[in-house]
Amino acid sequence: MATADRDLTFYTHSLCPYAHRVSLCLAEKAIPHKREHIDLSNKPRWYLDLNRRGLVPAIQLDGEVKTESLELNYFLDDVFDGAARLTPDGRKEEMQTVIDSFDGSFISAGLQFVGGGWGFRRGAPGPRQVDRMAEECEKIERIIEINGNGGPYLMGSEVTLADLALWPFAERYELAMREFQGVELREMGPTGSLSRWIDAMRSRPSVVGLRPDDNKLLASWRRTMRLDYFDYETADVDNP
């Protein structure tokens, strides 16, 4: 396990959900690091030289650059001591299977529900989009009941990397679905486990500290009608 004196730089965009995953991991584990905000609408040359694809998140540890949000969180939890261990003892493969089960499908279902791709539509989505999102919410509830033994978190009574992988997207979809479709994400889970999970996550200091201002975020979404508008114009958590 690494000690706190290693040179860690985190390259992020404060509104990117993938980078948000790593921000949560760093906060939960209280890992000291330097944070560099990257303007994705105008990527600096030095960053492209460092990270050829120019994407976030990325970290540089002792001169070595690593990318991909899930892989970064696995790496950070394995390598760094911290305030928390985010992989349950003896259940790493089970946790990875849980993450794999929702990583693509929940993200895709949510994007289609709020507008198809990364854009927004106003008004009700079609029956296919509703059914698909409902299936994903029911899947999350089954994970909580089976893998989490009732929760409140996905893997049980303690937060894990699985929760940090799902939360940035759930948080954005909850706000977008309420604003643009008049639908409450938490009500799409029939047993109430999804709602309790949302409440448990919202109570965590890391989540509270990294949450953007809803009113500012909604204003930016209404202006651009895109979840990923920050890829095209300068924005950050303080001025979305």
Regions found by a protein language model. Name each.
Residues 1-154, 228-229, 233-240:
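GST-like domain detector, emphasizing the conserved glutathione-binding G-site
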Residues 21, 97, 101, 139, ...:
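Alpha-helical scaffold segments in carbohydrate-active enzymes
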Residues 43, 183, 215-219:
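Short amphipathic alpha-helical segments embedded in low-complexity Lys/Glu-rich regions
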Residues 89-90, 124-131, 178-196:
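Short alpha-helical "patches" and their helix-cap loops
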Residues 151, 174-180, 207-210:
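Substrate-binding/catalytic groove segments of enzymes
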Residues 156-181, 187-193:
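GST superfamily/GST-like fold recognition
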Residues 188-219:
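A contiguous, mid-protein "functional segment" used to position or interact
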Residues 207, 214-240:
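Long, positively charged, glycine-interspersed low-complexity recognition regions
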